């Protein structure tokens, strides 16, 4: 009986994927690729693109912040989807 209960607990944890954390790219513009592990139950990544006097600027990170005027924002929901 204990073995069956333990098996059910393990299967539940595996199926629910408890403790899953999202991984997103967080490099800016043309920097080398780096990633970050998102905290606080964040389940999305973002990529923002805009233009200034220096050319195209890109920012990446966790979450899905509100885009300001003139900024193109893409949000996605899988690991490293904001490349």
UniProtKB/Swiss-Prot annotation:
Keywords: Acetylcholine receptor inhibiting toxin, Disulfide bond, Ion channel impairing toxin, Neurotoxin, Postsynaptic neurotoxin, Secreted, Signal, Toxin. One of its GO terms (cellular component) is extracellular region. The keyword Thylakoid does not apply. Residues 1-21 form the signal peptide. GO terms for molecular function: acetylcholine receptor inhibitor activity; ion channel regulator activity; toxin activity. It is found in: Secreted. It comes from the Eukaryota. InterPro entries: Snake_3FTx, Snake_toxin-like_sf, Snake_toxin_con_site, Toxin_cobra-type. Its main location: secreted. Expressed by the venom gland. Disulfide bonds join 24-45, 38-62, 64-75, 76-81. The keyword Secreted applies. Belongs to the three-finger toxin family. Short-chain subfamily. Type I alpha-neurotoxin sub-subfamily. Binds to muscle nicotinic acetylcholine receptor (nAChR) and inhibit acetylcholine from binding to the receptor, thereby impairing neuromuscular transmission. This is Short neurotoxin 3FTx-Oxy4.
